[in-house]
Amino acid sequence: MKLLPIDRWLLPKGRSRRSLFDMAHVRAALEDLFGEDLHLARVRSMANGVVGILGASLVSVAAIGRAYARIAEIESKSGVKQVDRLLSNDGVLLDEVMPLWIRHVLGKIENILVAMDWTDFDDDDHTTLCVYLVTTHGRATPLAWRTVKKSTLKNRRTKYELDMVKRVAAWLPEEVHVTLLADRGFGYAELYRMLEGNRWDFVLRFRENIFVTKQDGTKAKASVLVPPNGRAIRVTDVKVTGKLDPVPAVVLVKRKNMKEAWCLATSLKTADANDIVRAYSRRFSIEETFRDTKDITFGLGLRATHIRDASRRDRLLFLIAIAHSLLTLLGVASEASGLDRTLKTNTSPKRTMSLFNQGAYWYSCLPNMRDDWFIRLMTAYEQIVREHIYLGEILKFEPPMPSEK
């Protein structure tokens, strides 16, 4: 299997540093990454779309096309038509591009934490099932997704979810070990069994009214077993629901800042309960990435864009995933160079602007950025890319490992 390292995003020698992520740079990088596996014309079209997203104020077809046209110095209507044709191109198969994208993000990383969740686009009767890499910076990195009609979800949801796990398992390099996080809607026996069959670990929340049966045969609702003092407890070798589905362990906790208790089914039966809770708390990073993608005020505004066809949405989400990752990478350079301090309007030592939004800001500044700041930013960017082989190495969160106790 060909590996797709991150050094493709270094500028070629002789190119001006101010041309970072311009059309020539993005085209060359994507051709190098995907050109052997995909038709070259399609790769170039995808690169044009990514450049359009980087330069657009909104991820609508018209806005992306006009931004691309402005950069490519072509007629605006031509840019819009090119983007529209790309999104409708049945030759751009997500089953082909997603495995390549996953290889680019993960490379040879052996241990990953991923979150799975649905996100809705109600105005278009769409809902998208996503599997994202959980990271250290509060935003999950897109790995795989599939959009379906929300009105057809009834009685098919479980099938879609199991199929997604099956696909991702097939696309991942064999040596990658996965720990899956998911909310209450995913806490069912069929998923437990599939994850165990794939040798994936999991931390899946389930409802408080589900019965938990201990080894000694005592049975109670999960809500009854939650400690009142805010401590997390782990109960091993239990059975859940009235059907007595076996689960290696459950972790139960309700802390002061929690609206509801967390009842977590997990395969990590020897891991510390607090580590399980800490890992599950990272699940919310997928929702923050949804906001980056959908919110018209704080993100790319996909919620305001009407897309009737589910396949068009999935192709657009692929372009967004690339653009989002590049801007996040630039945001990492922002903090490494210390330039993030110039963006803060307070004295808080904590991050007040996401890496994605930092990257988006500095990307817009590149053409006219003052020289001393520009040199600091680009030096940090190049050092980060050279010191790491794969994108996921820079951002990933280490899953909880079973304790030795």
Task: Locate the predicted segments by residue.
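Single, function-defining residue in the core of a domain
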Residues: 2-58, 99, 110, 136-405
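Short amphipathic alpha-helical segments
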Residues: 47, 61-62, 80, 84
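Nucleic-acid substrate recognition interfaces
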Residues: 54, 70, 89
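Short, charged amphipathic recognition helices of the HTH superfamily
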Residues: 56-66
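Short, basic interhelical loop/turn and adjoining N-cap
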Residues: 68-82
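Short active-site-adjacent helix-start/loop capping segments
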Residues: 73-74, 122-125, 190
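Active-site-proximal, Lys/Arg-enriched surface segment
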Residues: 78-138, 144, 149
